[in-house]
């Protein structure tokens, strides 16, 4: 039994502070990204503003989580902060998959429109994310071990796996198109730079999915109860690294590979459109 007015278990008593620190880290990342947007007005795409919005949702989510756990720890109930936390968890979770999908599809970076198959993926991911967040809320508010809890846990796991798989398809298609374009036209060096960039981003996405869905689960299932915070910490570190790495790859600077190719392609827009099969 914990000494003093601490209603959290021993392994979770440090979580309020940890999430507050995580919120500060994401606040710093948001400040840096905002500065980049201000200083690089001539190199901006719409996706950069969506990435900014994603960072904002993530930052607010971290602070709401910290406040929720703080009040649970000191008063035994979240004083309504859990509702705000669930709202921004939904916004952040849904927006993260949408942004990954749009970056992977090359939307606003390679082309101004989504292809029909990419639109279909998007219409699948959004409802799945709504279902995933409903399951997450139920799991957070109900007693573990009941039949209903186990059912919603299985639904959450299945839906999460489907979303993770779905967002990879547009990225794979973009890599395939870039590879074919690099082999067929005379702009090999330009397209190879962009191809390598998307290949690296694919590796980062796969590594993040593997770590956050498998390694974190193994931590949670194997560490002693006094170290329950380790899985939460590893999840936050992985997410922070993923956000920072993604921002670095697609930052709005003149020497970024996708921007260099975009400027080059303005002289032959019709050829580029045919190469990528853009549909309105």
Question: What is each model feature region?
Answer:
Residues 1-131:
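Hydrophobic alpha-helical transmembrane segments corresponding to the first two to three helices
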Residues 77-280:
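Generic detector of multi-pass transmembrane helix bundles and their immediately adjacent loops
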């Amino acid at each position: 039994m914990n000494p003093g007015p601490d209603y959290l278990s021993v392994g979770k008593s440090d979580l309020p502070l940890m999430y507050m620190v995580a919120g500060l880290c994401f606040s710093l990342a948001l400040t840096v990204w905002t500065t980049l947007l201000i200083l690089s007005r001539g190199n901006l795409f719409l996706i950069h503003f969506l990435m900014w919005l994603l960072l904002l949702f993530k930052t607010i989510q971290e602070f709401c989580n910290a406040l929720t756990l703080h009040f649970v720890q000191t008063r035994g109930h979240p004083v309504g902060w859990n509702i705000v936390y669930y709202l921004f968890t939904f916004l952040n979770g849904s927006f993260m998959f949408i942004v990954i999908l749009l970056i992977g599809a090359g939307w606003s970076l390679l082309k101004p429109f989504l292809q029909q198959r990419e639109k279909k993926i998007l219409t699948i991911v959004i409802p799945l994310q709504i279902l995933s967040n409903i399951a997450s809320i139920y799991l957070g508010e109900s007693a573990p071990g009941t039949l209903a809890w186990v059912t919603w846990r299985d639904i959450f796991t299945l839906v999460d796996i489907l979303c993770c798989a779905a967002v990879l398809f547009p990225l794979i298609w973009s890599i395939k198109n870039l590879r074919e374009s690099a082999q067929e036209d005379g702009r090999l060096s330009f397209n190879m730079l962009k191809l390598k960039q998307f290949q690296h981003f694919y590796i980062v996405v796969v590594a993040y999915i593997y770590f956050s869905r498998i390694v974190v689960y193994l931590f949670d299932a194997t560490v002693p109860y006094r170290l329950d915070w380790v899985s939460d910490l590893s999840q936050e570190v992985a997410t922070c690294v993923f956000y920072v790495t993604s921002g670095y790859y697609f930052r709005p600077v003149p020497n970024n590979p996708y921007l260099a190719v975009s400027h080059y392609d303005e002289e032959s827009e019709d050829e580029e459109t045919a190469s990528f099969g853009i549909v309105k």
